[in-house]
From Swiss-Prot:
Annotated spans, Disordered: 88-127
PROSITE patterns associated with the record: SAA
Post-translational modification: This protein is the precursor of amyloid protein A, which is formed by the removal of approximately 3 residues from the C-terminal end.
Subcellular localization: Secreted
Lineage: Eukaryota, Metazoa, Chordata, Craniata, Vertebrata
Protein induction: Upon cytokine stimulation.
Expression tissues: Expressed by the liver; secreted in plasma. Also present in the liver and lung irrespective of induction.
PANTHER family: SERUM AMYLOID A, SERUM AMYLOID A PROTEIN
Xref: SMART domains: SAA
Domain of life (superkingdom): Eukaryota
UniProt-recorded name of the protein: Serum amyloid A protein
Alphabetic keyword roster: Acute phase, Amyloid, HDL, Secreted, Signal
Pathological association: Reactive, secondary amyloidosis is characterized by the extracellular accumulation in various tissues of the SAA protein. These deposits are highly insoluble and resistant to proteolysis; they disrupt tissue structure and compromise function.
GO cellular component term of the entry, any: high-density lipoprotein particle
Organism encoding this protein: Anas platyrhynchos
Amino acid sequence: MRLCICFVLLAVIVCASADNPFTRGGRFVLDAAGGAWDMLRAYRDMREANHIGADKYFHARGNYDAARRGPGGAWAARVISDARENWQGGVSGRGAEDTRADQEANAWGRNGGDPNRYRPPGLPSKY
């Protein structure tokens, strides 16, 4: 009986530590949820800062934070960024040039670039 229990425990430990599709899928979902939270946090900070010219910085920072979580976070950042730009492109009337610049900042952050490249002068250090 003890040998059987030991065997079952060993089997559970081996299966739990294995790189299986369920573990990877679960990690992807958790990364995506965390990435969505990172994007929301960057949006809230942008609204709170209310600083002229800071939108590109917050775009890059949200994508950067989300992508650092892993493939799920990078996927969430890409989906959210693309959806936001597609929606804003038709509603805000800011133009194609601004949308292109936003997408450049999104890609910069998502690819691991330092968001401070887009940091405007005078933005409080808390951001």
